[in-house]
């Protein structure tokens, strides 16, 4: 057998099914427009909701930290890699999320893996929304707990599962705060109400809600006025926050336990000084410059309204994630490719990221987009969709 022949066969099948994707290379800093293959294109695919990736305050904080503390830390947190700034960031995150404590992980993905794999045992059950992020799914797979999946945001189905799982040590309901492929918000008040009625715990992944929802971007828990009633909040520092990493926030007991049992935290080198300092500065920007969130929502409302007027089919998004439903993988890829040739970077999302036949162009609006950029992007989308007979 040729080396990895079985892998090549699978890759060939992906190409045949139009689910193969070529990574596009960006040649400038992230922003409302970027350069791809030497051409300036409007960026509608990044998670840089507030434009903080290139905010002068974050860039300057990163520069200062690198010059003073070096390029890296040289150790894991539990041995010799905890700098003063790491503790400062965690205190700031805990205050921001209105919890007793917080712990920073190397990524949002490893945060979910670390939390779920460490706190769940064979005595427990984890109850997960069917459209939760891949990191939640993989985190659950690492546990010995029983697993149940409830239909997407279906509270009757969630209650059915809760009623049938009364004999476990802990029942943990896990949900995305904002669902990344559709842009809808979890019905968190209803989830919390059921959890309290059936003595269950709640964990919310606010990857796409931190910096977007709630006062100053505190997330879905704060958005719904549920501070103190959700047991575990996780999120990223790489989307609206604009840098890198993930975090868990909750009680002091939870965070102390994760420090000792969270394997991704225990066995990964701590974040470089530049990354940590930029994250600290990002939280300060959220607290001190609310105009970024205001502009984000203004741009989102404008863009959605114009797409609907075109006759395009959108998901029931409630956030700056604005997916245009296409259906067939080949058509979604064709539209994405055509948009790029005309100056709009809007990535297609196909199987296995979404279900087969549910392919889409997922656009994400940011605070940095100007009206002129949005209008230009809208015109390109309109003409390309018409050319491909999608409207």
Swiss-Prot record:
Pfam families: Aminotran_1_2. It is an enzyme of class 2 (transferase). Its cofactor is pyridoxal 5'-phosphate. Pathway: Cofactor biosynthesis; biotin biosynthesis. One of its GO terms (molecular function) is 8-amino-7-oxononanoate synthase activity. Substrate binds at residues 133, 353. GO terms for biological process: biotin biosynthetic process. Disulfide bonds: none annotated. InterPro entries: Aminotrans_II_pyridoxalP_BS, Aminotransferase_I/II_large, AON_synthase_class-II, AONS_Archaea/Firmicutes, AONS_Archaea/Proteobacteria, PyrdxlP-dep_Trfase, PyrdxlP-dep_Trfase_major, PyrdxlP-dep_Trfase_small. The modification N6-(pyridoxal phosphate)lysine is found at residue 239. It catalyses: 6-carboxyhexanoyl-[ACP] + L-alanine + H(+) = (8S)-8-amino-7-oxononanoate + holo-[ACP] + CO2. Keywords: Acyltransferase, Biotin biosynthesis, Pyridoxal phosphate, Transferase. Pyridoxal 5'-phosphate binds at residues 108-109, 180, 205-208, 236-239. Its EC number is 2.3.1.47. PANTHER family: CLASS II AMINOTRANSFERASE/8-AMINO-7-OXONONANOATE SYNTHASE, LD36009P. Homodimer. Belongs to the class-II pyridoxal-phosphate-dependent aminotransferase family. BioF subfamily. Catalyzes the decarboxylative condensation of pimeloyl-[acyl-carrier protein] and L-alanine to produce 8-amino-7-oxononanoate (AON), [acyl-carrier protein], and carbon dioxide. This is 8-amino-7-oxononanoate synthase 1. It comes from Bacillus velezensis (strain DSM 23117 / BGSC 10A6 / LMG 26770 / FZB42) (Bacillus amyloliquefaciens subsp. plantarum).
